[in-house]
Amino acid sequence: MLEISLDDSDLQRGLGQLLRNASHPRPMMRAIAAELLSITEDNFAHESWGGRKWPANARGGKILQKSGQLAASIHTASGSNFARIGTNKPYAAIHQFGGTVKAKNKPYLVFKVGDGFRRVKQVKIPARPYLPMSKGGTLQAGAESRLLDVALDTLARGVRK
């Protein structure tokens, strides 16, 4: 008769660590928030969302980078059950989702164009999504796998020797 004894102490230790990591998700959520920021920074750098290029702007130059304030305002937060990314800039939503800006307090919006000025009643801003999710909460192409990799790496910390 053949008898094999298996020392599964390493397996038991690893599974125990995995369970401990899963029961304390704050580090994983912090890592996910950091990855959301990294994806957003990639979007600004590549002027695209999930590989889809943003519409060009009329002034030329880097898109959504006239002053750099929008990109600099991106911040994250995380806790035991959430990872969040956002900005406090009042003009952020119009760039993320697009829309029409209309003159409110005066009859016209005024824009400097070259050496002169242009007056219009409204201007259509195309969507140039920079955050890695849509209005409906859908992640951009490639983001889901990046976030899953981060989550799995964080859960596996301390499991392998």
What are these regions (language model features)?
Residues 1-96, 102-161:
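Short, Lys/Arg-rich flexible segments
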